[in-house]
Amino acid sequence: KIFHTQDLCLRTNLRCAKDSARMEINLKKYIAAIGICFMALGAACIMKTDPEEVGEELPELIIGSDNYEPYNYLDDDGKPVGIDVELAEAVCEQLGYTPVFQYIVWDKKDEYLDNGKVDCLWGSFTMNGREDEYQWAGPYLYSRQVIAVRTDSKIRNISDLAGKRVAVQATTKPEEVLLERSDPRVPEVDMVYSLSGMDEIYASLRKGYVDAITGHESALERFVGNAPDMYAILDESLYISELGVAFKNDTHQDLAKKMTQILKEMQDDGTLRDMVEKYG
């Protein structure tokens, strides 16, 4: 067959026009598909605003405490447990923080706060009498500061401490009460031994270095419960402590306020009571 040049050009132009139209349709479909993908991605981003959902790490709250059963201590696996530990974990979950527990020497607690090694002190810490020294959250618990003696001791009440040797934890309320004697019930003792931790305090009574020891009732109850034939707690309490969470003064005001509200809610709904009973 003989093709005329004019016919060939016409057919070629028609084929080119069809191909061009087909490409334009495919391009529009491609652009539309991309648009749908971006819209879906945007919707997913809007929906996943929780840092945990999108895989973001929560900010850390560094909590300083010493080893003080049943409030804060290590279990057999080396994991922090106790009333204050569970409470801190529950509160931090609501606040959007990851709690990190830093064990410290308690009588150096202010240094840790001042140099920023910890954000707060959360370890059966007494608020009353220290209201202006820290930025507080709480109180969340009330605790009796009590006195433990050997069962063969003649000490039966606070007045019997006159001329006796008493072991306390350094920088705590019992130390202050015994040294300053602002309470008229407290007599002049022979010696106040200010020790760094409860293990040393318990050992001092076991070995007969002191006549009496003091501490939070829940802690001394555990000590006495392990040897009830050897030790006893006096009925008369030395002090009633309001326990709180301490931040460096004039810092973390908003966080402390929110924390106080959550702690109050946990008191009201019985959550805190259940935690305390768990560690009995």
Segments and roles (model prediction):
Residues P70-D75, R130, E176, D254:
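Short, solvent-exposed loop/turn elements at domain surfaces
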Residues G82-Q94, D152-I155, S159-R165, A170-K173, ...:
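Extended ligand-binding regions for polar small-molecule ligands
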Residues F3-E60:
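Short, low-complexity disordered leader/linker segments with a strong preference
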Residues E52-F125, S194:
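Extracytoplasmic small-molecule ligand-binding "clamshell" domains
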Residues K108-E111, S124-E133, V177-E180, S204-I240:
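A ligand-binding cleft/hinge motif common to bilobed small-molecule-binding domains
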Residues S65-N67, Y142-V149, E217, E221-K264:
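Periplasmic-binding protein-like
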Residues C45-T49, T98-F101, K173-S196, G225-P228, ...:
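Ligand-binding clefts/hinges and TM-proximal coupling segments of bilobed small-molecule sensing domains
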Residues E89, E93, T98-D160, Y231-S237:
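Acidic, polar ligand-binding/catalytic clefts
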